[in-house]
Amino acid sequence: MPKLEMMLLVLLILPLSSFSAAGEQVVQGDRRSDGLARYLQRGGRDVQECQVVTPGSKWGRCCLNRVCGPMCCPASHCYCIYHRGKGHGCSC
């Protein structure tokens, strides 16, 4: 089987969603494993300041901790925790 035909066959078998836009393979899992994946990837993220979304809210846009997903805690003494069934939250 020629190489071109083999490559086309492989592309038909593999789902396109298993690759990122950069061509890297991504791992998909259930909701419980997503937190672990974010935790393992957080080392490559640049640390920036969090911005509070709304006054009085304990959530800000996440820059400090990948475990919190798209959010983070606005105070430096707070940290992100995960409650089974409830999701991520801040503990201050």
Curated annotation (Swiss-Prot):
Disulfide bonds: 63-72, 68-80, 73-90, 78-92
Modified residues (4-carboxyglutamate): 49
Tissue expression: Expressed by the venom duct.
The keyword Disulfide bond is annotated on this UniProt entry: yes
Propeptide segment residues: 25-45
Coiled coil: none
Gene Ontology CC terms: extracellular region; host cell postsynaptic membrane
Source domain of life: Eukaryota
Residues recorded as bearing 4-hydroxyproline in the entry: 55
Main function: Alpha-conotoxins act on postsynaptic membranes, they bind to the nicotinic acetylcholine receptors (nAChR) and thus inhibit them. Through its two C-terminal domains, this homodimeric protein would bind to two nAChR allosteric sites, located outside the nAChR C-loop of the principal binding face and at the adjacent binding interface in a clockwise direction. This toxin specifically blocks mammalian neuronal nAChR of the alpha-7/CHRNA7, alpha-3-beta-2/CHRNA3-CHRNB2 and alpha-4-beta-2/CHRNA4-CHRNB2 subtypes.
Family according to the record: Belongs to the conotoxin D superfamily.
Domain notes: The cysteine framework is XX (C-CC-C-CC-C-C-C-C). Displays a mini-granulin fold, a structure composed of two short, stacked beta-hairpins connected by two parallel disulfide bonds. This newly described fold is derived from the same cysteine connectivity as knottins (ICK fold). The name 'mini-granulin fold' comes from the structural homology with the N-terminal region of the human granulin.
Protein name: Alpha-conotoxin-like Mi20.1
Organism annotation: Conus miles
